[in-house]
Amino acid sequence: MLRDVIESYVPFCEQEEVDRREILRLMDTGMDLMHRDFPAHFSASAWVVSPDREHILMAHHRIYHAWSWLGGHADGEEDLLSVAVREVQEECGASRVRVASPKILSLEILPVQGHVKRGVWVSSHQHLNLTYLLEVSRDEQVHAREEENTAVRWFTLSEAETVPEEAWMCEQVYAKLNRRLRSFP
């Protein structure tokens, strides 16, 4: 099922076409990419917008010390849309998360630097990431999840491309998501 979703995805740009081919190649190796035990594994992210699509909900990530989109590891779950919804609910406490579209918003291979998580070293690895467009009302009560992030807040679309402290993510991912958002159903 996941392979069919990725094969049928129409890339938005050259980066997505190249990354899509690499993800499909990795899937052909027979490695278990659904669990984080491997140096490349699936993750799901959410570009969480307000219903008017003027604001993005982001969390200040505890490990990266930066404002970031919401999401997490597949951990064996092949339905990455469900993973994205669950992660939004867990990471910001939103109870009313609406799937704006079941289609993939974007696809990317994300490099993850080695880091310490819960006192244990996690080696550098790659996230084979699918991003989905989700909606949360700005009236919804959201809050930080202490073990994952230190704060949660809304940003305008332009702020989402400039405020986060990770320049690569701003330039290569968040700006792309905003461009894609303008033409996404």
Regions found by a protein language model. Name each.
Residues 1-2, 19, 128, 169:
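Alpha-helical structural motif
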Residues 1-10:
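Generic N-terminal amphipathic, Lys/Arg-enriched alpha-helix
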Residues 10-45:
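Acidic, metal-coordinating catalytic segment for phosphate/diphosphate chemistry
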Residues 34-69:
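N-terminal strand-loop-strand
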Residues 75-168:
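Unchanged
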Residues 165-185:
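Charged phosphate-binding loop/patch that engages nucleotide di/tri-phosphates or the phosphate backbone
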